[in-house]
Amino acid sequence: VTRQLAEQLTRGTALRVLDVGCAEGTQALRLARAGHFVTGIDPDPGILAVAHQALAAEPPEVRDRVQLLTGDGHQVGRWFGPRSFDLVLCHGTLMYLPDPDPMLASVARILAPGGLLSLLVRNGDALAMRAGLTGDWRACQEAFDTTRYTNRLGLPARADRLAELSGTLAGFAVPVRHWYGVRVFTDTMPDEAAPVDGRQLGQLLDAEERAGKQDPYRHVAALLHVVCAK
């Protein structure tokens, strides 16, 4: 996702960034280190405390470019005015919203003209893949006919079908500019099975990056990275 996002950003330009659902602040801090001004919001005070700890370990020039707030995506329209941000990230957020349209509408309003919206969502067109690859055939059959699922944390969640999401975003005047597949080959890989050798890990990431850009591979990815432009 980091590599994909970097492809879409103009090099050498400091952006005003909003990270909705910033969690531990991984992406927010990475962007701040690159010279961007980042506001991160998350509804979980506990996980936001982890982000504050990580921020405290950064150099002063990075800390000065980051603001962390407790809240959720539904509040962005009240907190920020139109054209407030050049880039908005909503990574792993939409899947927990029964109806994401109100938040997407708010995000579209606070984007500046030419601004980018980066979404990371569960791929509703390939929801049966994980269950099928792990041999859970009942769950596989059920997944063909729904966009609802239970995630690995045991929480209810929802997936997005690309065509439907694209139509919604176009209606909010933030049409899709590009989209990628994420976790094409590694969705069923246990965390402990990830390569520890740096060379092998690099090969894995290169393979995922390449597959995420190409048909038919990206269509069966577990996640979709959708980049929109206002």
Predicted regions and their residues:
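Conserved alpha-helix/loop element of class I SAM-dependent methyltransferases that forms part
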Residues: V1-T13
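A short SAM/SAH-binding and catalytic strip from SAM-dependent methyltransferases
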Residues: L87-D99
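Conserved class I S-adenosyl-L-methionine
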Residues: L116-F144
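Short alpha-helix
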Residues: L155-A173, W179
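Conserved Class I S-adenosyl-L-methionine
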Residues: H178-K230
